[in-house]
From Swiss-Prot:
GO terms for biological process: adenosine catabolic process; hypoxanthine salvage; inosine biosynthetic process; nucleotide metabolic process; purine ribonucleoside monophosphate biosynthetic process. Substrate binds at H14, D16, G170, D279. Its cofactor is Zn(2+). The record marks H221 as: Important for catalytic activity. This is Adenosine deaminase. Its EC number is 3.5.4.4. Coiled coil: none annotated. Binds 1 zinc ion per subunit. Gene3D superfamilies: Metal-dependent hydrolases. Zn(2+) binds at H12, H14, H197, D278. The active site is at E200. It catalyses: adenosine + H2O + H(+) = inosine + NH4(+); 2'-deoxyadenosine + H2O + H(+) = 2'-deoxyinosine + NH4(+). GO terms for molecular function: 2'-deoxyadenosine deaminase activity; adenosine deaminase activity; zinc ion binding.
Length: 333
């Protein structure tokens, strides 16, 4: 189901949602951090989704053990490096890794700007080692409020040339986009792209707000767009992409079952939608699973899956020249 003549991308992938269970175990031992289990087999139910969670907020608690072991900037650097190694193992040629430095820093009160620098270093070294092309998206964790998001924004701005885009993630219902208008004004002034988690827990009005008020060029998840025909028309006409995450939307109970997922309808409507993982370490999936298992289960035809793969590159925060070079590099293999 994956077209090997085309670049394989993952443009909605949380770095802090892809910390290996084995790494959690090792860092826990290294820093004498009490974990809920002492073997890999018994730890996995605590750090991976075994049964679907009742809602998004419940799902997000599964990420907590991964960041609780980030007791130093070296630990942050390690998990960033391993994220690139995992991407290479999955056959990804290009990945956009997004991360919330405030969330990663929280358990051990690490300097937020230091976390950003450590992630940049780890990703850079991983790209050199494994030959993967990567860009970084800064996340503001709306769940922690406006002031915490401001701190994250300042940390990103201190490294503005290494950050490609700004995102807003977390509790969409409790912390609407309207609270963060000034943050996104500064992001646009910095020349960054904008992608926003919207229409996952909240309705289509959240997507409209992300586009009109925050300047979103892409929407993370965006499943509730299916409820608003005018919105779907607008997304298609304006080529505002939807970063679909199939398995994730089932595990968060955002969508009841894969057969009911709106990705197929989005593609039929001419919306530029792509296939992505979200939090692969927590979900226990990889991009290959999403293409070969989840996408067919969601009713996508072989041609629709190929179109979603094409869309992944077209939606990427790359220049036209970078996209062309990536296509040529894959075609030459």
């Amino acid at each position: 189901m994956i077209d090997t003549t085309l670049p394989l991308t993952d443009i909605h992938r949380h770095l802090d949602g892809n910390i290996r269970p084995q790494t959690i175990l090792e860092l826990g031992r290294q820093y004498n951090i009490s974990l809920p289990a002492q073997s890999l087999e018994t730890l996995i139910p605590h750090v991976q989704v075994i049964a679907n969670e009742p809602d998004l907020v419940s799902f997000l608690t599964k990420l907590d053990w991964g960041v609780k072991v980030l007791a130093s900037l070296d630990a942050c650097r390690r998990v960033a490096f391993e994220n690139i190694e995992d991407a290479a193992r999955n056959g990804l040629r290009y990945v956009e890794l997004r991360f919330s430095p405030g969330y990663m820093a929280m358990a051990h009160k690490l300097p937020v700007a230091g976390v950003v620098e450590a992630v940049i270093d780890g990703v850079r070294e991983g790209c050199r080692t494994f030959g993967v092309q990567a860009k970084l998206i800064g996340i503001m964790s709306r769940t922690f409020g406006e002031a915490a998001c401001q701190q994250e924004l300042e940390a990103f701005l201190a490294h503005r040339d290494q950050i490609t885009a700004l995102d807003l993630a977390g509790d969409e219902l409790g912390f609407p986009g309207s609270l963060f208008l000034s943050h996104f004004n500064r992001a646009r002034d910095a020349g960054w792209h904008i992608t926003v988690h919207a229409g996952e827990a909240a309705g289509p009005e959240s997507i409209w707000q992300a586009i009109r008020e925050l300047g979103a060029e892409r929407i993370g998840h965006g499943v509730k767009a299916i409820e608003d025909r005018a919105l779907m028309d607008f997304l298609a006409e304006q080529q505002i992409g939807i970063e679909s995450c199939l398995t994730s939307n089932i595990q968060t109970s955002t969508v009841a079952e894969l057969a009911a997922h709106p990705l197929k309808t989005f593609l039929e409507h001419g919306i530029r939608a792509s296939i992505n993982t979200d939090d692969p370490g927590v979900q226990g999936v990889d991009i290959i699973h999403e293409y070969t298992v989840a996408a067919p289960a969601a009713g996508l035809s072989r041609e629709q899956i190929r179109q979603a793969q094409i869309n992944g590159l077209e939606m990427a925060f790359l220049s036209a020249e970078e996209k062309r070079a990536l296509r040529e590099k894959v075609a030459a293999k």
